[in-house]
Amino acid sequence: MDTATADPTVTGAGAGRPGGRRRFGAGCAALLFAGVSVVVGCRAADTDAITPVPQLLAFLPWLLVPTAAGLLFTLLARWWTGAVWGVVLLGLLAWFIEPYGKAGDPVGPPVAELRVLTSNVQFGRAADALVDVVRREEPDLVFVQECEYTCDATLKRELTDAYPYRQSVAGGGSEGSVILSRFPLRGTAGVPGTMGMPGAVADVDGHTVRLQLAHPMPPLPEQVRLWQRELGRLRDAAAADRDTPTVLAGDFNATQDHAAFRRILDTGLRDAARLAGADRTPTWPSRTLPTLGAQIDHVLVSEHFAAHRTRVLPLPDTDHSAVLTNLTLHAAP
């Protein structure tokens, strides 16, 4: 009698525990997939949407991690519909991780070689480190962001002999920016923004090249619209003259996974890092997550240029790595 009454109780408890674990696993997977789906859906819809989507889009490749974790939960829970959901998300992420934009070599004859370096020196703190890198690497054009008054004075004192031509926007904190050049420069209006974005026209061995420094505001939660507007102004500047060779370089505070940045590429500009096979190399935050970060510093070039090598150079005293690329300018066919 005692044995007969005990058996159903033991059987019922044993059957309930696996079902609870499966429901828990399926719930965890659904939460992970739902979050990833929002970001991937915005990427597919070509929109940066609202916070927190722009911030998460910067790290889109790393969404593979929660997606893979969710897929593991679905397998443990034997939730096959969820497994299909996870596989679809993995496929979409793999598709979007591929390089965006045009590639290919120019068709005209080569006419000039030049090296371009861009660096965000974080409120001028890395000015001395930048001077060392510039002296070692000897770029022809240097785009410097967040170069406040002390930084500007340092660059004038240390680099004027090697870079006699400059175009700058003076400012404190993050507002100052400067373009240094071995080639003669003629200043242009630049692009209006909260932080300085000077522009110039360079005479590169007798060939006209448009130069524009990029430094739009970052997509902080309270200023996503401002970030989009300033990237839009850079897009308009890029589209204003597609026939003249152009270099647009700086801290864009955006990756290829942001719709506002892709619209700049859609004007015909190409990312030199992508052309040289380094399109996903992180540049920020270089001090805290150097291998898990995002590529937000770029050298964009028009179809007149070929990029042979692009390197990401860590600098002390700043949270951005510098980007150095070797370019060949080709004449129109």
Locate predicted features.
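Soluble catalytic domains of enzymes that build or remodel membrane lipids, polysaccharides, and related
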Residues: 116, 122-135, 144-333
